[in-house]
A protein has these predicted regions:
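N-terminal export signals
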Residues: 6-29
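Structured, non-membrane catalytic/scaffold regions adjacent to prosthetic-group chemistry
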Residues: 31-412
Length: 412
């Protein structure tokens, strides 16, 4: 009898032979295509990045189809929260489950708990206090496609991120029911998605126990007031505010507490940065080596959301520059904008503070008083005094690209 995994392998093979036409996500018809990404992406990236709509999603920028990796077009970042149907999609494996909420179970256990147990979705929602917070989910490789020289990996542009209100229960409350032993070191997380090839490593990650016990680390079951979308982790996913999305395990099925560093391809060698390259406050000490460290918290960054490179504006026009800024949860202190290529800077007006893990909207206006090229830049600084980089900090996996953005406008 053919099992589901073999069936999916056969489907993939069939798609390769048949051109994948009928089973591809539908291509948006009759709509103006948004920008597929900034200039500078590797050759062939823009040509292959079609505007596709996965079931239940608006047309998003397709970076890969198998596994599905789709980024959010820029226009959806001109609001406080990213709509669920426009939220980016990130998977490492192509065997993505259709989870029955009634049949879903979460196994909580491991060598370093006193009382392992199993939770249903109903019990998770009824037995523990519900909390809600705003937090940015950002892929570790966002803007990887802008690295020079280019590096291997999904060639993300600007949109492998989204801001949402997440509702769920604190992971620490669930772990308290299990009872942690004193030797507990890491919490291992496993989701229901699987590789198509049996020899490929399952996507499993761990958190240091102190981060798992942080009051802001959630087992989320709602996103922007609705159940989690299928493509964003239904029915339950981990939310680790301030840390990059690699830890935000989707379709969560297992939480295991262990007394030793967890060994997994996705912990080492994947998702590592050279030691000492970036100023990191939240370190994952049990997973560090002499030369590298796991990527953890997001670095301070910003994005101009209402203008595009090469856009024309009229001489004498007052040009509004709008955008968003974020960091690893310390809070944005200032955003400065330059309209003359960095020779002078002015403070932008910050929008409503939605919480330290949310992005912060900002705006600034300048007069386009002379014809020619006007180079617009934006630079964010957080409450620790950390600012964006003016030059790329190269690392072989293409992480933490927070270089100050430069957009050339044409004043005509």
């Amino acid at each position: 009898m053919t099992n589901r995994r073999q069936f999916l392998k056969d489907v993939v093979a069939g798609l390769a032979l048949a051109g994948a036409g009928p089973l591809l996500p539908r291509l948006a018809q009759g709509a103006e295509a948004p920008s597929m990404g900034p200039a500078g992406l590797p050759a062939g990236t823009l040509e292959s990045s079609l505007l596709d709509a996965l079931p239940g999603k608006k047309p998003l920028i397709k970076r890969t189809f198998r596994p599905p990796n789709y980024e959010t077009p820029l226009e959806y970042f001109n609001q406080a929260f990213t709509p669920n149907d426009a939220f980016f999609v990130r998977y490492h494996h192509a065997d993505i489950p259709e989870v029955d909420a009634q049949a879903w179970r979460l196994e909580v256990g491991g060598e370093s708990v006193e009382k392992p147990f199993t939770l249903t979705l109903e019990a998770l929602q009824k037995d523990f206090e519900a909390v809600e917070l705003a937090a940015l989910c950002l892929c570790s490789g966002n803007r990887r496609g802008l690295f020079e020289p280019h590096v291997a990996g999904v060639e993300w542009g600007l949109g492998a991120m989204g801001n949402a209100r997440w509702k769920g229960v604190r992971l620490k409350d669930v772990l308290a029911r299990a009872g942690l032993k004193k030797e507990a070191l890491e919490v291992v997380l496993q989701g229901a998605d699987r590789p198509l090839v049996a020899t490929a490593p399952d996507f499993a990650k761990s958190l240091p126990v102190w981060r798992a016990l942080d009051e802001n680390t959630l087992l989320a079951y709602e996103m922007n007031g609705a159940p989690l979308p299928h493509w964003n982790g239904f029915p339950v996913r981990l939310v680790v505010p301030g840390w990059t999305g690699t830890y935000w395990m989707k379709h969560l099925t297992s939480v295991q507490v262990v007394a030793q560093p967890f060994k997994s391809f996705w912990m080492n060698p994947a998702y590592r940065i050279p030691k000492g390259k970036f100023a990191v406050v939240d370190r994952f000490l049990s997973q560090e080596s002499d030369t590298s460290t796991p990527i953890t918290e997001m670095v301070v960054s910003s994005l101009i959301t209402n203008l595009k490179a090469g856009q024309q504006v009229r001489q004498g026009q007052r040009v509004e520059v709008r955008g968003i800024a974020w960091d690893g949860g310390y809070g944005i202190q200032t955003v400065e904008v330059s309209s003359d290529g960095g020779r002078s800077w002015a403070a932008a007006e910050l929008g409503k503070d939605l919480g330290r893990f949310s992005w912060r909207q900002w705006s600034h206006a300048f007069a386009a008083d002379r014809k020619g090229v006007r180079t617009v830049m934006a630079k964010a600084t957080n409450r620790l005094g950390s600012s964006q980089a003016f030059e790329l900090i190269f690392n072989p996996a293409g992480y933490h690209n927070n270089v100050v953005q430069r957009l050339d406008l044409q004043v005509v």
